[in-house]
Amino acid sequence: MANQQIGGSTVTYNGAIPMGGPVAINSVIEIAGTEVLVDLKLDYATGKISGVQTLYIDLRDFLGDVTVTMPDTGQRITARAGTQGYYPVLSTNLMKFIVSATIDGKFPMNFINFPIALGVWPSGIKGDKGDPGAPGPAGGTVVVEDSGASFGESLLDTTSEPGKILVKRISGGSGITVTDYGDQVEIEASGGGGGGGGVTDALSLMYSTSTGGPASIAANALTDFDLSGALTVNSVGTGLTKSAAGIQLAAGKSGLYQITMTVKNNTVTTGNYLLRVKYGSSDFVVACPASSLTAGGTISLLIYCNVLGVPSLDVLKFSLCNDGAALSNYIINITAAKIN
């Protein structure tokens, strides 16, 4: 038997809270026929970020799988189409990441300098027949599940009645998801208690003219949404609830929150869209060209929320407008997730 040579040790940046505090670099990755090299060496050298220990990959509106390779350690992460989540990273101060995908397109990805437990959950907007762009969840609900859950023949009861098959729940599992793709049906048993890995509290809403939104959103006027009538498509824990003011944070739920807001509109393709998230006295505003929002434009933020126990103050507020035209045909998907 040949001896296996073991190389020398490598200093990595995992398992420690950085002294400079939590930092994330937000980006939108565009794949066009080839892999993309993300080089954060300059950001590291100038002190903008102290290292990368976690990736947040948002593929809710992306129909292909994405692979991220760390050339310094050889680690390779693959994120499935239609999911979003946090992936622990094994990296050094090389600060280079190779990103590839099975199809061309754009998707948000955040580089985070502190460790977050693995947490991956399905898209909150997956619709009928598996169409991620459909305005509604499949079967009226979307199950939050452990990304590692899977099952084999041992969970299938082939002695059931003709034309039927029984699927046994995974031990400690939270449910079974059935997705109708038209020519085939996918049955998946979920496990892990439905906690979404490191995500303890999360809420996903769909806001449109048919789900609580006004018939028209005025041009160039950011007015906070009344989310009391928004459709709840995904909910984890009890720390986040919808209200007329926005997404209410429960007492004792201070921490870091991942906020994403995606808008689609097929009628207004000129000017710019303004997307705003507010918490307390802080406003976060992003401007997106209207032409990009026909396929979906996203604001993705990491916000530390200090919950004071005062309901009128402990609320995330959302608003959107076009700077030149009123909106009458829109779908807005809003997700807030407590990650630590």
From Swiss-Prot:
Compartments it resides in: Virion
Gene3D superfamilies, alphabetized: Minor capsid protein
Collagen-like domain segment(s): 123-141
Membrane spanning residue stretches: none
The entry's keywords: Capsid protein, Virion
GO cellular component labels: icosahedral viral capsid, spike
Record's keyword annotation contains 4Fe-4S: no
Coiled-coil intervals, chain numbering: none
Role according to the record: In association with P31 and P2, forms the spike complexes located at the 5-fold vertices of the capsid. Essential for viral infectivity.
Domain comment (free text): The short collagen-like region is proposed to act as a trimerization signal leading to the fulfillment of the symmetry requirement of the minor capsomer.
Protein name: Spike protein P5
Organism: Enterobacteria phage PRD1 (Bacteriophage PRD1)
Lineage: Viruses, Varidnaviria, Bamfordvirae, Preplasmiviricota, Tectiliviricetes
